[in-house]
Amino acid sequence: MTEQAEDTMPIRFTDAAAAKVKTLLEEEQNDALKLRVYVTGGGCSGFQYGFTFDEKVNEGDFTVEKQGVQLVVDPMSLQYLVGGEVDYTSGLEGSRFFVKNPNATTTCGCGASFSV
C-alpha cells in the first residue's frame, strides 16, 4: 500500500482500535500479528463483520498502519467498508472492536450485522 493521508483512506483505523491491538500483540508477544476485518454473509441483516488476528497479508489486501500495528482488509470486504471506520470501545456492555459503516442501510440491534 502506498502512503495516503488518513482522510483519503478507504477505511480508517482509530487510535483507540490501534492502541488495543498494540496491547493485545504485546500480551501475545507476537509482533507479526495484524488485525484483519472482514465481511461475510450471515447475521440477521444479511452481512456480518468479523475480526481475527492474522500473521500474513495476502496479495490484494489493503493495509492501514497506525501506532506500529496494522489493520488488514481483503478486497472483497473492502468494497462494503469504503468510507468506514474500525474502532474499539470498552464499557458496561463489554469491550469490542466494531465498524462504523456509512454504507450500511440497516443494522441489527447489536451492530454485528448489516445490509447495504
UniProtKB/Swiss-Prot annotation:
Q: Which UniProt keywords apply?
A: Iron, Iron-sulfur, Metal-binding
A GO term for molecular function: 4 iron, 4 sulfur cluster binding
Keyword Nucleus annotated: no
- What InterPro entries does its record include? FeS_biogenesis, FeS_cluster_insertion, FeS_cluster_insertion_CS, FeS_cluster_insertion_RrpA, HesB-like_dom_sf
Annotated GO biological process: iron-sulfur cluster assembly
Q: How is the cofactor bound?
A: Binds 1 iron-sulfur cluster per subunit.
Q: Which cofactor does it need?
A: iron-sulfur cluster
Residues that bind iron-sulfur cluster, according to the entry?
C44, C108, C110
**Could you name the domain of life of the organism this protein comes from?**
Bacteria
State the SUPFAM superfamilies in the record: HesB-like domain (SSF89360)
GO CC list:
cytosol
Q: Which Pfam families match?
A: Fe-S_biosyn
What is its biological role? Required for insertion of 4Fe-4S clusters for at least IspG.
To which protein family does this belong? Belongs to the HesB/IscA family.
How does this chain assemble? Homodimer.
> PANTHER family under this entry?
IRON-SULFUR CLUSTER ASSEMBLY 2 HOMOLOG, MITOCHONDRIAL
Name of protein:
Iron-sulfur cluster insertion protein ErpA
Native species: Shewanella loihica (strain ATCC BAA-1088 / PV-4)
What does the organism's lineage look like at the top?
Bacteria, Pseudomonadati, Pseudomonadota, Gammaproteobacteria, Alteromonadales
Q: Which gene encodes it?
A: erpA
